[in-house]
Amino acid sequence: MEQYETEEQQVEAIKRFWKENGLSLVIGALLGLGGLLGWRYYNDSQIEAKEQASFAYQKASEELKKGEMGFGQAKSFIDSHSDTGYAILMALEMAQQAIERKDLVEAAKQLEFVVINAKLSAVQSIAQLRLARIQIEQGEFELALTSANKVSDQAFKGQIQEVKGDVYLSQELFDKARAAYSAALETNNRDQVLKMKLDNLAVAANG
């Protein structure tokens, strides 16, 4: 997967991929299978269902952006399209909205749905790391470490170490925090936030 500096960029890239390629992938798959099995095994309703799911996702996403009033429609969308990639994207959006409203319980619930149901490793990793950060905010440090350790995708190695550093810092385990932040910085030495965390860590450790 192409490298992105932040999880937000990763999520936006995935959303763009689905919007731009979701239907074409379905059509392409049908064309390929049609050459082997014949179009008689497939009908227009399959493509139509994908189009409807895409339209419903766009509509629910727009309503969700309007605030809490759109939360119910977003939940209904997930219930109706739980077996599609659009449900995963909607859950990620709902989690972000919940975080902005300081509803960490709801945010964690949506992220857990993504972790369980997402088919792509990158999406699972994003959700798992966001869940770990929420658990830090809730003071659930051991759970946060467990969540971070569940991420096996090496593309997220730096973010895993950063989350661990945040946990250790919250626990005032300064040596472990420094080691984790340093390991994270090795994967992206341009990350100014990580550099700032290391600088602040030195102050905290001496305080």
Question: Where are the regions a protein language model picked out?
Answer:
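N-terminal positive-inside, membrane-proximal cytosolic segments immediately preceding the first
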Residues: 1-30, 52
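Acidic, proline/glycine-rich low-complexity intrinsically disordered segments
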Residues: 1-7, 12, 58, 62, ...
